[in-house]
């Protein structure tokens, strides 16, 4: 799946950039790297990329600000945030503002490769158990989710989704009225096991509820089943 995929690495650590360029190129990706937001902006005016690996702690504009800015511009490029070990608050904030995944430093390049592949699979609409194209539009309340085109609408108004949000929502709507544990959701949406220390599923659920629920504190469509996980209820009735 690596053929023709272009990866942009944004990190001020020159040695890490060189290592990732070499390793990801060996894995079949086209890789460019820059050291800061200014260089990134100049490059993005000339080239497009399938995915960005973005360091949180950058000189000048930091990774959180870059991610927020790109999402405010409706840039759909998936972003994997690179954070320092122990920066849980920053990881959660990164996911809340639209990062698709994160990886803490120090990391094994193989782990980053696995996460890149998982995000690109989601972006390519390759989730297991997906409905066929003929069954690809899911309607609930005022919303329509097109699983084939990865678009969601509130009545006629488009609602942009990150690849992470789409993956979690797709997993839920593909299993209506079936409570899904965090483990199951993580496996369906990200292709890996859930860690008890990880908050990414909860963060994505919170973001989705803010999009589709009139009262996110009392959700109708994405409900919590205590002790079991989360459940999608198409008609908004009690699970």
From Swiss-Prot:
Q: Any other comment in the entry?
A: Cross talk between this and the Che and Ntr two-component systems can occur at least in vitro.
Query: Consequence of mutating residue 207 to A?
Result: Loss of transcription activation
**Organism of this sequence:** Escherichia coli (strain K12)
Summarize the impact of residue 12 to A: Wild-type production of OmpC and OmpF. No production of OmpC at low osmolarity, incomplete repression of OmpF, incomplete induction of OmpC at high osmolarity
| Principal subcellular localization | cytoplasm
What's this protein's function? Member of the two-component regulatory system EnvZ/OmpR involved in osmoregulation (particularly of genes ompF and ompC) as well as other genes. Plays a central role in both acid and osmotic stress responses. Binds AT-rich DNA. Binds to the promoter of both ompC and ompF; at low osmolarity it activates ompF transcription, while at high osmolarity it represses ompF and activates ompC transcription. Involved in acid stress response; this requires EnvZ but not OmpR phosphorylation. Phosphorylated by EnvZ; this stimulates OmpR's DNA-binding ability. Is also dephosphorylated by EnvZ.
User: What is the primary gene name for this protein?
Assistant: ompR
A GO BP entry is:
positive regulation of DNA-templated transcription
* PTM annotation: Phosphorylated by EnvZ. Asp-55 is the primary phosphate acceptor site, but Asp-11 may also serve as a phosphorylation site, particularly in the absence of Asp-55. Phosphorylation stimulates the DNA-binding ability of OmpR. Dephosphorylated by EnvZ in the presence of ATP.
Tell me what effect the entry lists for residue 11 to A: Reduced production of OmpF at low osmolarity, reduced OmpC produced at high osmolarity. Significantly decreased OmpR phosphorylation in vivo, no phosphorylation in vitro. Loss of expression of OmpC and OmpF under low and high osmolarity
Q: Which SUPFAM superfamilies match?
A: C-terminal effector domain of the bipartite response regulators, CheY-like
Q: Which CDD domains match?
A: trans_reg_C
Q: What keywords tag this UniProt record? A: Activator, Cytoplasm, DNA-binding, Phosphoprotein, Repressor, Stress response, Transcription, Transcription regulation, Two-component regulatory system
What happens without the gene? Loss of expression of OmpC and OmpF under low and high osmolarity. Deletion of both ompR and envZ leads to loss of both OmpC and OmpF expression under 0% and 15% sucrose. Cells no longer reduce their internal pH in response to external acid stress.
Molecular function as annotated in GO: phosphorelay response regulator activity; transcription cis-regulatory region binding
Q: Where is the protein found, in the record's own terms?
A: Cytoplasm
| Stated name of the protein | DNA-binding dual transcriptional regulator OmpR
Substitution effect: residue 224 to C: Loss of transcription activation, loss of DNA-binding, about 10% phosphorylation in vitro
The induction field says: 1.8-fold induced by growth in 15% sucrose, no change upon growth at pH 5.6. Part of the ompR-envZ operon.
Domain remarks:
Composed of an N-terminal response regulatory domain joined by a flexible linker to the C-terminal DNA-binding domain; the relative conformation of the 2 domains alters upon phosphorylation.
């Amino acid at each position: 799946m690596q053929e023709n995929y272009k990866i942009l690495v944004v990190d001020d650590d020159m040695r890490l950039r060189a290592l990732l360029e070499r390793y990801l190129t060996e894995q079949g990706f086209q890789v460019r790297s820059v050291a800061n937001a200014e260089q990134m902006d100049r490059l993005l005016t000339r080239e497009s990329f399938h995915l960005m690996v973005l360091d949180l702690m950058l000189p000048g504009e930091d990774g959180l600000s870059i991610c927020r800015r790109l999402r405010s511009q409706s840039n759909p490029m998936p972003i994997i945030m690179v954070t320092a070990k122990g920066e849980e608050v920053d990881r959660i904030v990164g996911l809340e503002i639209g990062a698709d995944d994160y990886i803490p430093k120090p990391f094994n390049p193989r782990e980053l490769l696995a996460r890149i592949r998982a995000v690109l699979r989601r972006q390519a609409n390759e989730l297991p158990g997906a409905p066929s194209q003929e069954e690809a539009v899911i309607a609930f309340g005022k919303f329509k989710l097109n699983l084939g085109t990865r678009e969601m609408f509130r009545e006629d108004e488009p609602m942009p989704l990150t690849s992470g949000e789409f993956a979690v929502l797709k997993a839920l709507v593909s299993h209506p009225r079936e409570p899904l544990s965090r483990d199951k959701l993580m496996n369906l949406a990200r292709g890996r096991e859930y860690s008890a220390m990880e908050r990414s599923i909860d963060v994505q659920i919170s973001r989705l509820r803010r999009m589709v629920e009139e009262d996110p504190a009392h959700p109708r469509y994405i409900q919590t089943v205590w002790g079991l996980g989360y459940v999608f209820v198409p008609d908004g009735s009690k699970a």
